[in-house]
Design a protein with these regions (language model features):
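Outer-membrane beta-barrel porins/channels
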Residues: 26-43, 87-89, 98-363
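Beta-barrel outer-membrane channel/assembly domains of diderm bacteria
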Residues: 18, 60-63, 75, 87-90, ...
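Outer-membrane beta-barrel pore proteins
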Residues: 47-51, 56-69, 105-110
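Surface-exposed strand-loop-strand hairpins of Gram-negative outer-membrane beta-barrel proteins
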Residues: 44-49, 79-97
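Short, flexible loop segments at the rims of nucleotide/cofactor-binding pockets, characterized by
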Residues: 48-51, 93, 135, 221
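Transmembrane beta-strand segments of Gram-negative outer membrane beta-barrel proteins
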Residues: 31-46, 64-82
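Cleavable N-terminal export/targeting peptides
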Residues: 1-32, 363
Length: 363
């Protein structure tokens, strides 16, 4: 693809993103599923494909088919419109949406069976601020290091450690708390199997860490992150189109409280499907849809974790440009209104947008 065409494509994608706005693509609970622009373009259905260096986050076993040294850097610009309809009027959620960065690197020798990868991203985030309920903000970054083993030309395995770095602040009626945690760890393992010509299967399993917070007033509590597993299958159609379907299960029932706030959450399922059209050499167009089940129960809803079931649409594009590979993507999440009873009764509404940009280089 020539430079003029890539410049045109990039400018059109940027214009579309500006027209749509920028926002978050948060998943059930308080997860942030977008790990790269290429992933967002296919609604994060990437575990079976795992065909660029962001596989370090989606499925590190995919690095086994990516020779040499690679690096990627990017950002996900986010915007959110969240509110609750009450008998007395509309209550606005004053919490914002961050712009999480991501950084990935990998090394896989051309004739070797062992490789390594590194992923740094923001997989979880809370930022909700309600006038009557209070405020909660969790900023969490994860550093993952993996060892990759290519069993043969069709099967690869990977395993690694997760290091969580987080800060938490809360202000609720009668309670204020702020702390940070830099000593929490978890682990994960993954597999990619090229089961047949034009077919691939991926599995990614992660054990959630346990974050521990304390402050100078001897207040302390722990926050468990969910265990999760994703199973995926991808199929290439005539070398021109790739179709993928991913199913993710997250164990949000591990989350029981947020400091003094009781939390009642259910395990959730997210279904993701994506299509990639290889319309030119080294260039792609991407489309995706995801159904994301909310984890917050309607009968015991806590707006400090204001997640809702969502339908997500996304599109993206990528191509080589000036010696690097650039990807852009936009996403929109529609959340049907959620009618809540109990202590925080009301009709909760949410809309989310996202614009992601990633740049990768092979050395």
């Amino acid at each position: 693809m020539n430079r003029l065409a890539m410049t045109w494509l990039g400018s059109k994608a940027l214009v579309i993103a500006c027209l749509l706005g920028v926002t978050t693509a948060q998943a059930g609970g308080f997860a942030n599923p977008t790990m790269s622009a290429s992933g967002l373009g296919v609604a994060n259905a990437m575990v079976a494909s795992a065909d660029d260096v962001s596989a370090a986050a989606y499925n590190p076993a995919g690095i086994a088919w990516q020779d040499g040294i690679q690096a990627m850097v990017g950002v996900d610009f986010q915007y959110r419109n969240s509110s609750v309809e009450l008998p007395a009027g509309i209550g606005t959620n004053g919490g914002g949406a961050g712009n999480p960065n991501h950084l990935y690197a990998s090394w896989m020798p051309h004739d070797g069976n062992f490789g390594v990868s590194m992923a740094y991203n923001k997989p979880y985030e809370i930022d909700n601020n309600w006038t009557s309920t209070g405020q909660a903000a969790l900023d969490l970054n994860r550093l993952s290091l993996d060892a990759i083993f290519a069993v043969n030309s069709s099967l690869a395995l990977a395993a690694g450690i997760d290091w969580y770095l987080s800060t938490l602040s809360m202000n609720t009626p009668g309670q204020s708390f702020a702390s940070s945690d830099k000593t929490s760890f978890g682990g994960h393992a993954s597999m990619k199997w090229k089961a047949a010509p034009m077919w691939s299967v991926g599995v990614m399993a992660r054990l959630g860490g346990k974050l521990k917070y304390s402050n100078s007033l001897s207040q302390a509590f722990s926050l468990k992150l969910p265990d999760e597993i994703t199973v995926a299958v991808a199929h290439d159609v005539a070398d021109a189109v790739r179709l993928e379907f991913d199913a993710n299960w997250s164990r949000w029932s591990r989350v029981k409280s947020l400091n003094d706030q009781a939390i009642s959450m259910r395990d959730s399922i997210t279904l993701m499907t994506g299509a990639t059209w290889f319309w030119r050499e080294n260039s792609q167009l991407r489309f995706g849809y995801a159904y994301d089940q909310g984890a917050n129960k309607g009968t015991a809803y806590n707006p400090l974790i204001a997640d809702q079931t969502a339908h997500k649409l996304s599109l993206g594009a990528g191509g080589d440009l000036y010696g690097v590979h650039a990807d852009v993507a936009v996403g929109y999440a529609f959340h049907p209104k959620k009618n809540v009873s109990g202590a925080y009764a009301g009709t909760y509404r949410d809309r989310r947008f996202s614009f992601a940009l990633s740049v990768a280089k092979r050395f």
